[in-house]
Structures are given as structure tokens and as C-alpha cells.
Amino acid sequence: MKIAIPVDNNSMDSSVCISFGRAPYLLIYDTETEGSNFLDNSAAASQGGAGIKAAQNIVDSGAEAIITPRCGENAAEVLKAAEIKLYKNTNNSIRDNIESFKEGKLSLLDDIHPGFHQHGGK
Amino acid sequence: MKIAVLSGKGGTGKTLVSVNLAAVALDSVYIDCDVEEPNGHLFFQPKDLQKERVTVKLPQADPELCTGCRTCVNFCKFNALAYIKNKLIVFNEVCHSCGGCLLFCPQKAISEKEREIGLIQSGISGNVRVVSGMMNIGEVSGVPIIKKLLQDSRKENKNVFLDCPPGSACMVMESIKDADYCILVAEPTVFGVHNLEMVYELVRIFQKPFGVVLNKCLEEENPAEDFCLQNQITILEKIPFDLELGTMHSNGQIAVRKHPKYKELFLNLLKTVSKEARHETASDT
Ligand code: SF4
Ligand code: SF4
């Protein structure tokens, strides 16, 4: 099964990125083959809707689960429609989180924030 | 002449200044661009109300025609579209209604539907035509409403007073785009200076002629005034801190219609502003 993690760098020694939509890279990790693939998150630089685009990229990668510290409302809607499960990371290490995931120790992410909209003038 | 009244945050006296200026001018239009919390109409209590819906266009895909090519998803710069499980999802609040996806869909699968985001209400209060933009609750951006307000105001040849949204974000920029002159309202505190600086930056970026009205002035030190002096900013008027004025305002009364003292103060301000604005236009040429 493939899982996705927003990460700060394109290396397994990198850490989980605190942002989902604006993470520089998205790690797609295959739990069976243990292969890892780092996608450039093309959404990171976009003006708005970064979460939506990042979520679309993850869906397109074929991942079935995501480990992330947080997720915006819109992105969550995309992931829900794609039936991708969201898990909350326990710490910053990619490897630790993958291990915890394999052992079924991660809990589902329920903290979905309303998103930071640049427009609207607030 | 179109005059925009702005301040870095709410409660500074922006509505006090714009409402009273409009009321003291002979024949004028007051436009409330603070679409999230319009309250100018509470003072004017306009009659003969007319309401007009403001809508934006939203794309929708016909699942029968859509082949899932994702041309639209890739095109949308605002990332308002996602294609998931053979279905196009449109994020209403993210969509800017640019119509691009509709143009670029090779299957002609996208059509537009209207969605109401707010309304514009206008009416008459004595010498003032009062126009207010009101954004529906839960909407993210009032920019389309402000655009519509300003479009309508372009037809006016009377003096127009724009009560801008607080702050300095998109909606404020939209509001001051066609103003001939900007009045910045500031409070005499350190926070007041901070808020003033925000709008000061903005009017400079937009290269608008402007001046400051210092509100709630006491005899004591006034950091906002110091800021103006340091930066050679024109001080148009100093409105004294005055319980009577505050009470009238919080009771929804228009000071210039109640009290000759304030009528004189705002008439003076209007004169100063007109002179400043004319001076600016003259030196442009
Ligand atoms: S109308 Fe424009 S902003 Fe809205 S979804 Fe289509 S391309 Fe994106
Ligand atoms: S461009 Fe048209 S056909 Fe292609 S995914 Fe979008 S709606 Fe469907």
C-alpha cells in the first residue's frame, strides 16, 4: 500500500513538514516494496488552493493513506472523495512515522482547519 | 470627486467621518464598501430601498460529456478544481469566476451557474444617496460586491464618499482603485500609529493623494500626529475627543444633522479635502 507524507526535503532523513499544501515535497512510500518516491509539490508556490492541488497530486500518485500534522478543509474534501485516510504523525521523523503506521499505532487526524484564504481581506 | 475613507482597523472613526462628510455635502453619494459589516445605513436609515442581488458564475461539469482529461484542473491557477474518482469537484469559495476552464474544456462539458454571494441595497436619506454592499454570511471574498459597487459609482457625477473596509487587504485595494483622494483616519495612540502606517503604505503604493484626520484627540501627546509631522503628511482635521459626539455616533445619529458645531467641523473638513484634491489634480497636469 502506498502512503503519502508532506516532507521538508527529498530524503528519507528529512522531517515531516508542518504544512500540507505548502510542503516542498510529497513523499510517496510503498509499504510493500519499501520504495520511496519524492514528488515536487507543484502546489507549494501557488497563490491559493495549494491544499487542493497537493491533494490532487497525492490522489494521482495512487496513495491510499496520508500521514500529516494538519490538513485544510478543502484538501480534506478532495481526500475524502478519493477515500484516502488521514493519519496524524506522532513526531517529525519520517521513518518513525512509517514504523508506527505499519504497527497501526497512528490515530486518524480529526483536526481539519478551515484553511488560510489569502483573499477576502481578513 | 470620489473620496475614499480608510483606516487600519475598525472602530477608528472611518464610518463617523464618511457618514458625516456625505451628510454635510450638498448632494452626495455614500457607498459602504465594508461589505462584511456595513453599518452606514444604520445612520442614514435610507428610504425607497432598492435591492439587487450580486452573483458570481461558477463552473459545473456535465458528467456525461466530461472525459476526465483534466485540462481544466491544470488550467485553473486558483486550484479551484479537482478531478477525483471520475468526477470534477469545484471549490466554490476558491473559484474566481474567470471562466477559463469553460473556454479550455475540449469537450465543452463545462457550463456556468449563478451563485448569490450578497446584495447591494440603495436608498435615499435627505441629500444623500446611500448605497451599501452586503456580503452573505460564510462568503470568503467580498471583492465581486465591491467591484459592482464601484462600477455603479462610476456613473455618478456627484461627490462620492467611499467607506472602505478596515485594514489594507484586497478588498481595500479594490475600494481605493478609482478614488481621487484618500482620507486616512487615525487614533491618537501607539496602536493608532501602527494602523495608520498600514494604510499609509497602501495609498503610497497606489500613488493616491491623501491626508489624515486625527480622531479622538485629547490635549495630551498624540503619537499619530507625531507620525504625520515626521513624514510630512497633511493633517486635514483634528476631531476632538468628545463624549457628546461619541454618544450621538453610538446611538446611530448623524452629528452634522443634529448639531451646528459638528456641521461646521465637517464642512471645514470637506472644504479642506476639496481644496487638497483639486490641488493634487492641478499639479498632476
Ligand atoms: S472559473 Fe476560473 S477560477 Fe473558477 S474553476 Fe474555472 S478556471 Fe478556476
Ligand atoms: S477539461 Fe472538460 S473534459 Fe477535461 S476534465 Fe475538465 S470538464 Fe472534463
Q: Where do the language-model regions lie?
A:
Chain B
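Inter-motif core of Ras-like GTPase G domains
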Residues: A169-V190, L196
